[in-house]
Amino acid sequence: MHFRRTMSRVPTLASLEIRYKKSFGHKFRDFIALCGHYFAPVKKYIFPSFIAVHYFYTISLTLITSILLYPIKNTRYIDTLFLAAGAVTQGGLNTVDINNLSLYQQIVLYIVCCISTPIAVHSCLAFVRLYWFERYFDGIRDSSRRNFKMRRTKTILERELTARTMTKNRTGTQRTSYPRKQAKTDDFQEKLFSGEMVNRDEQDSVHSDQNSHDISRDSSNNNTNHNGSSGSLDDFVKEDETDDNGEYQENNSYSTVGSSSNTVADESLNQKPKPSSLRFDEPHSKQRPARVPSEKFAKRRGSRDISPADMYRSIMMLQGKHEATAEDEGPPLVIGSPADGTRYKSNVNKLKKATGINGNKIKIRDKGNESNTDQNSVSSEANSTASVSDESSLHTNFGNKVPSLRTNTHRSNSGPIAITDNAETDKKHGPSIQFDITKPPRKISKRVSTFDDLNPKSSVLYRKKASKKYLMKHFPKARRIRQQIKRRLSTGSIEKNSSNNVSDRKPITDMDDDDDDDDNDGDNNEEYFADNESGDEDERVQQSEPHSDSELKSHQQQQEKHQLQQNLHRMYKTKSFDDNRSRAVPMERSRTIDMAEAKDLNELARTPDFQKMVYQNWKAHHRKKPNFRKRGWNNKIFEHGPYASDSDRNYPDNSNTGNSILHYAESILHHDGSHKNGSEEASSDSNENIYSTNGGSDHNGLNNYPTYNDDEEGYYGLHFDTDYDLDPRHDLSKGSGKTYLSWQPTIGRNSNFLGLTRAQKDELGGVEYRAIKLLCTILVVYYVGWHIVAFVMLVPWIILKKHYSEVVRDDGVSPTWWGFWTAMSAFNDLGLTLTPNSMMSFNKAVYPLIVMIWFIIIGNTGFPILLRCIIWIMFKISPDLSQMRESLGFLLDHPRRCFTLLFPKAATWWLLLTLAGLNITDWILFIILDFGSTVVKSLSKGYRVLVGLFQSVSTRTAGFSVVDLSQLHPSIQVSYMLMMYVSVLPLAISIRRTNVYEEQSLGLYGDMGGEPEDTDTEDDGNDEDDDEENESHEGQSSQRSSSNNNNNNNRKKKKKKKTENPNEISTKSFIGAHLRKQLSFDLWFLFLGLFIICICEGDKIKDVQEPNFNIFAILFEIVSAYGTVGLSLGYPDTNQSFSRQFTTLSKLVIIAMLIRGKNRGLPYSLDRAIILPSDRLEHIDHLEGMKLKRQARTNTEDPMTEHFKRSFTDVKHRWGALKRKTTHSRNPKRSSTTL
C-alpha cells in the first residue's frame, strides 16, 4: 500500500507544464508556412513554376532598384530603369557613365548585382529546398543521422570482410608448396568428409614404416620432455616453424591444438607404445635433422582438414598434463593462446575422478546445454598392459568446425567418427577408423554474468549454435544425415557424461528467459572437435561442471532459464573465471559482443552501441595508427592480424572485437540472404552453394577459404587493418550500390531512382537533405570567398601602382573603391566599370587582366566546373566513412537531384571542352584577323595576344572592352555577336540534358527508338526488291547491271538503317529536341525586338549623316542584351553603349531583352532540382518510374558521350573496312603484274 500511495502522487507532477520556447528559426519557418497557407491560390495560379517565380523576382528587383536609384534625380527615369535592369540581369549595358553616379547609387548597384546573379538565385533555391525538406519529412534531421550511422557500420563490416576475402585468395595463391604430397592428403580428406569407411593405414601404406618410426620417436620424446621445459608445446611449435624455413613463422598460432594450449606434454605417454597399440599414422611428416627428438605437428589446416592423428595426439598430450591433486580442487583446464605471452601450468589431476566409465576410455566433453555444444566421447582400447589408466574430463573450447572423434565400441551410430579396434583389423591393417561426418553447426557467442564479473580477469563465454537444418544443406547427402540425426535423437543414444567438479556459483542475470526456444533442438547431441588456436582468439572458454547427473541436469536447467540477452552497452566486456577464484588463471581480456538477438545485419547495424563500438574500433586502426610507409602484399600486410608475429601484437586488443563482429557479420551477410532494395530476403536455398570445399589445392590449406560457418574465420584476416594494398577509401559497393544507401537502388538516366518503397524514399530523402545542407554551406563559402579573394587581389595592386591610381582618380573614383567594384563586376559578370572607357585604360596592365579573366570564368559559365572540382577535392580529403564524405559522394554521383548548376562528370567535361573550344576559337580568330590592325598597332605583340585572350573571354559573359570593338574586322564583330548568342547555350543545354525528368520535360513519353522507321524501311526495301525483280526479267544487260547495282546499294542502306542502334536515335533526338526548343524560345523574340526597334529608329537608320547607326549595330546591341553580355559597338564620341542613342520605346525593348535573356538559361519547369518536396513530386517520380519500367531502359551513360563513342566506333570500322578494301584491290594488280 505504501508503494501504491507513492505512485498516486506521480500525477501531481504531471500537472506542471513547461511551455516550449520556439527558437527564431522555428518561428521563421512557421511564419513562412503561414504565409504560404494564405497565398496558396496565388502560388498555384500566378507562380506555378520556378521560371514564373524567377520572372517575378527579376522584374520586381528591377523596379525596386530603379526606385532606389531615382531619388537622386541625376538621370531620367528611363535611364535609371535601364541601368537597374542591366545591374539585375548582369547585362552591363549603360546609358549613363557609372562614375557620374553618386556613391549611394553605386553601392545600390553593387548590392543588387550580388543578390541577383545566377549563383545567388540558384543558391537561394537550394536553401528553399532545404527548408522544405525539413517541413515535408518529419524528423528528417534525426532520421538521416541514424541512417548514416547504420550505413557506416555496415560499410565497415563489408569492407573488412571484402579485404579478408581478397587477402585470403591472395595469400592462398602464394603458398603452394609440396603439391605432390598434398594430393594424397586431399584424396584422403575427400574420402574423410564424403562419409566413406576408410583406413588411414591404407592411405599411407607406402610410408607405414617411416610413420611407425616417427610415432615411436614421438612417444619417446614425450617421455623425455614432460620433465623439462624443452618439452613444452612452444618448443614443438618453434621447431616446426624452423623446419619450414620460416614459411609460417608469422603463423605461429596455426600449428595444432597443442600449440595454442598452455600445457606441457602428456605424462601418460612416457611409455613407449606397444606394437599392438592403437596407432595413427601422420601423413606427409617432413624429415627433420637428427637433433633433439620432439613431437611432430602437422601444418595448419582448415578446420575441415584435421587428421585423426593430430586430434588423438593433442588429446593425449592434454590429458598427460594432469597432476595428482585432490578431487575437489582446482579449475578446469584452461587453454590459452600463444599471444598471452606466458605459459601457465595448471594442476589437472584435480579433475581426475571416477566417472563410471571404463578406465581405458578417454572422454572429451564440452559441457553446457546453455552453449548448446555437442556431447561426444573418444575412446580407445589398449591391447597391452601399458594402456592409459587415468580417467579425466577435459573442458575446453576446441572450435566448432571439425568432426568429432567418437567411440564405436557400443554406440556406433552415436557420433560422426568412430574408432574401432577389432581383432581382425589389428592383424591386417591395424585399427580402422570409421567416419560418419555431419556438419557441426555454427555457434554464436553468448555471455553469462556471474559473481566473478567483479573480477576483471574472470569470464565465461557461452556459444549459441545456428540451425541444424540450415547447416546440413552444405554437405552432400544432407537429407540422409539429417535423418540419422533425428533417429539418434529419437532413440536417445547419447551418453550423458558426468563431471568432476560442482559449479558452486550460479549465474546472475537480469536478462529474458525466452532465449533458448530454438537452441535445444537436439543440436547439443553432435559434439565436434577442432583446434581453435590463434593469437587473436576472440573467445576463450572456461567452464565448470557439476558432480553427478542430477546436478548436471539441475545446472543445465538453470542455464536454460538464464539464456542471455546481453545488453549492448556491455557488449565489449567479457571475463573468464574458474572454479577457484583464488587460483584464477590470468587470461588476456578479450572484447566480444553478444549478437544472438540480432536477426540480420540491418537490425544489428541500427543498434547505437554496436555502431559506436564498430566505429571506434575502426577509427583506432585507420585514423590513429601512424602509417609512415605503405606495405605491399608481401610486406607484413596484416601486421596485427593472424599472420603477425608476437612482436607485432603488442598493441591494444581491438582485433578480437573485430574478429567477433566480423565473424557474425559475415554469417549474417551469407545466411540471411541478399540485400535487395532495402529488404533482406532470407532464402535457405540460395545459400546452399556458398559453402564449397576447395579440394585442398594449397598445401597448407590456405586456399580453403573458411566460410561463415567456420569459427576460425577470424584467423584469416578478420581484423581491422589498413595495411592491405587497397585504397582505404575505395568504394567497395561501386556497381552494387553506394555506401550512402543501405540498399541496392535501380537508377535510370540522370539519377532517376526507380521503384522505391516508402522507407527507401525516406532514407534517400535524408541523404539528399544532408547533401543539400552541405551544398548550401559550400555555395555560401564559394560565393563570399571568391568575392573576398577578388578584391584582395585587386585593391593592393591599384594602390601600389601610382600610374593607374592617377588614371582612376582623374575619373573621380577612389582607387580602393575601384578595386572593390571591379572585383565584383568581374566575378558577377556585370561588365560595368567606374572608368568611362571600360578597361581600355588598362590594356597594358597584365596582372589585373589575368586576374579578371579567372574571375570572369569562375563567376558564370565556369562555375559548375569549379564547383564540382571543389566538391571532388573535398571528397578526396574528407575523413573516410564520415558524414561529410557520404554527402559529398552523393553530390558527385547525383548532382542534378540537388542543384541546377552542378552536373555529372561527363556533362562537366563536355562543358569544359565546349567553353575552352569557344574561347580558343575567338582568340585564334582575333590573332589571325586583327593582330596587325590599327586598333592594336600601338601595343606590342605580347600585349596583343593578351588583349585578344581577354576580349574573347569577356565576349561570352562579362562584356568588358579592352579595345574599340567598332574598329575591329567585320568578321570578328560577327563572330563576337555569334558568341554572345551562344554564351549561355552550353550551360543551358547542360542543365536540360542532365534533368532527371528530361524526357517528360521534352514531351517524350515513349521509346525514342526507330521501330516505325525500321518497318517502313523494310516495306520500302521489299518494294524496291520487287521492282528490281521485275526489271531483272527484261532482256537488256545494261538494265540488269543497273538493277543489280541499285539492288546492292538499297540493301546496304537497308542494312545500315536496320543496324542503327535505337539508343543512338534516342540520343540524337534528345540533343536535337533541346536545340530546337532553345531556338524556338530565342529566335522569334530576337527578331521581334529587332523589328520593333527598326520601326522606332527608322529615320536614324536611313540618315546618311549617321553611318554608324545601322541595322547591324542594332542587332549587335539586341544580341548583347539578350545574351546578358554587355558588349556594344558604341557610338562615336560617346563612352556609353549604343543603346543611349535609342528612343524610350527602343530602350524598353532592350530592357525586355535583358529580362528575357536572364531566364533563357534556366531549367525547364519540370526539373527535379527546382521542384519542392511534395506529393506532386512523388507523383512525378511514380510516373517516371512506370515509364522507364515499361521501356525497360536504365542506361546511365551520358548521351553526348554515348553518341560520340558510337560515332568514333563507326568511323573506326569504316576506316578499317576501307583499308581492307584498298588492300584487296591492290593485291590482284600485284598478282597480275607478277604473272
From Swiss-Prot:
Gene behind this protein: TRK1
Compartment(s) of residence: Membrane
Biased amino acid composition, Acidic residues: 237-247, 510-539, 1010-1031
Ranges of compositional bias, category Low complexity: 219-232, 1036-1049
Protein purpose: This protein is required for high-affinity potassium transport.
UniProt feature, compositional bias: Basic and acidic residues: 198-217, 540-563
Keywords noted in UniProt: Glycoprotein, Ion transport, Membrane, Phosphoprotein, Potassium, Potassium transport, Transmembrane, Transmembrane helix, Transport
Annotated glycosylation sites: 100, 169, 222, 227, 251, 369, 383, 497, 501, 532, 580, 677, 919, 1030, 1135
Transmembrane intervals: 49-70, 78-98, 107-127, 778-800, 813-834, 838-858, 862-882, 898-918, 923-943, 971-991, 1078-1098, 1111-1131
Modified residues (Phosphoserine): 15, 414, 534
Region called Disordered, residue ranges: 161-310, 323-344, 361-441, 488-565, 671-706, 1003-1063
Keyword Secreted: no
Name assigned to this protein: High-affinity potassium transport protein
UniProt source species: Saccharomyces cerevisiae (strain ATCC 204508 / S288c)
Any single GO CC term annotated in Swiss-Prot or TrEMBL for this entry: membrane raft
Polar residues composition-biased segments: 164-179, 248-274, 370-415, 490-502, 680-706
InterPro entries linked to this entry: Cat_transpt, K/Na_transp_Trk1/HKT1, Trk1_fungi, TrkH_K-transport
Principal localisation: membrane
One BP term from GO: intracellular potassium ion homeostasis
Family per similarity comment: Belongs to the TrkH potassium transport family.
GO molecular function, one term: potassium ion transmembrane transporter activity
Membrane-topology annotation of the record: Multi-pass membrane protein
